[in-house]
Amino acid sequence: VTLERDAASLFRRMHLVIALTEVNSRHLRGESRRAGAEIELACALASEERDGVSPARAACIEQLRERLGEAECELRAIESARDRLENELAQLDSRASSGTQGDWQ
């Protein structure tokens, strides 16, 4: 029974590490997306300041602000998922080190 429990714990740990790797990759892409939106917004605002306000520019700036907000919201969701996975992994490791899951570490 202990061997089966150890194998299940090891499999679960492997699954969590893979999921964390995927979440971290999504986070990096999300940070790039947010940075791109920030740069585009800054350029649009500078252009508006230099060339003046126009309805088309105002609409573009509003769209860029929405994109930035969406990117930030997506990052918060990714960070929440990462926190959940990290906590689950820490709990699994804690149980393993306390001896309740055998000695596979």
Regions found by a protein language model. Give the residues of each.
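Short, flexible coil/linker elements and helix-boundary hinge sites characteristic
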Residues: G52, G69, S94-R95
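Short, charge/polar-rich alpha-helical segments
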Residues: T2-G36, G69
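Extended alpha-helical coiled-coil "stalk/arm" regions
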Residues: H27-Q63
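Alpha-helical coiled-coil oligomerization motifs
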Residues: A35, A42, E49, R76, ...
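Short, charged, intrinsically disordered terminal tails
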Residues: T2-F11, E86-Q105
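Non-transmembrane, elongated alpha-helical coiled-coil stalk/scaffold segments that mediate dimerization
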Residues: A7, M14, T21-E22, C43, ...
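Amphipathic alpha-helical coiled-coil segments
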Residues: H27, C60-A90
